[in-house]
């Protein structure tokens, strides 16, 4: 180790439903809404890069706190703070990408579902031939049959 330097170890959260919900919760706290897309928003950009741009314009308490905590930090300090703070958001992105990779038929409706939509599907993925896991707009989750999912998705705003 070099004198005068500190090594910061950042542990990645697991790529699972719980991490995705934590990341979605943080997104709402930062932006007061869900992002329109989780992946490719725009193409070849990470979700947290897009979020950082949106946070600059946001006046939610959590966004204001983050901006205040970044004041006076060195460039390296800002980078570390952002990585640690935004880790749950990267978790949403990684989990969704894993669902795509594993061919779990995921879908995300952040463009039309809000945190107030307690009965609307925000995100879903296949867990078996006849069942899907659903995260609703208020971030509660449950397993539903594919028939129930079809009803829920038919009720989404157009």
What are these regions (language model features)?
Residues 1-120, 130-132, 137-158:
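Conserved hydrophobic/amphipathic alpha-helical signal-anchor segments
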